[in-house]
Amino acid sequence: MFHHCHRILLGESAFLEIRRIQLDADRELRTNFRVFRGSDYAAVVEAMRAGHSELGYLGPASYGLARRVMGERIAPIFRYIDNEGLEGYHSVMLVKADSPFQQVQDLRGKTLGFSDPNSTSGFQVPGWFLRRQGMDPASFFARTGFTGSHEQGVMAVINGTFDAAVVAYSNERRNTFQRMAEKGMIPSGAVRVVWKSPLIPNSPIVIRKDLPAALQREVVAAFAALPERDPQAFRDMSSDARGLAVAKHEDYLDIVAILEENAARRRERRS
């Protein structure tokens, strides 16, 4: 039996979704878990690197960053299967529904909002794919900037701060702007998609591999059983995902490669 207080650290957008599993984990693992909110993904990575958190929920690119600074001390254990049965999601570029822009090419010389430099769908993946399609954001757009989050990116487009923004998108029934409309934050149909990336593997739940092996096994077993043992807690945790799929480092090798190429480009520009 483990008597320490263990920590699950999450990026801000994941915090409210997973908060309910704290008592469930306490009961199943016979130990105290506490859920904390990180200010951003970089804060979650740093907390895990420093040994202040045992578990985390990271974006794919943030996992790549964590792997770069922690090596094999961190590993993914699960990712969500969404309500359409998919184990991945997309980056999409949004514009106002009543704007004249119909495709990315129409946005040459306009402005683009990224969400966060450590975001997979909000920065790393769209930048890489746009360059591959001959539209380097640094020169294609008149101005780019960071909005701070996916929701703020949607608001920046609606408010006219940026002509377009890139955000996360799982499917028509589960995406950033659909959730905002359901909450009454924006009118339904206020934005539309003009570009969509290939499928990105869903964000991983990660664990520190320097934890006792018995605790790691119990954590994995507890998460694996959660969808059937406490369906409501799982729905709260996952935004109505269908289930969990086992995740491994190899699933994120393409994301790691994109991160390395993006980092190399930044080094070249600085030199």
What name fits each language-model region?
Residues 1-64:
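Extracytoplasmic small-molecule ligand-binding "clamshell" domains
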Residues 2-14, 106-122, 163:
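Short loop->beta-strand "edge-of-pocket" segments that line small-molecule binding or catalytic clefts
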Residues 22, 45, 60-63, 104, ...:
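Extracytoplasmic/secreted envelope proteins and their assembly/folding machinery
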Residues 42-56, 69-70, 105, 150-170:
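Short helices/loops that flank or line small-molecule/ion binding pockets
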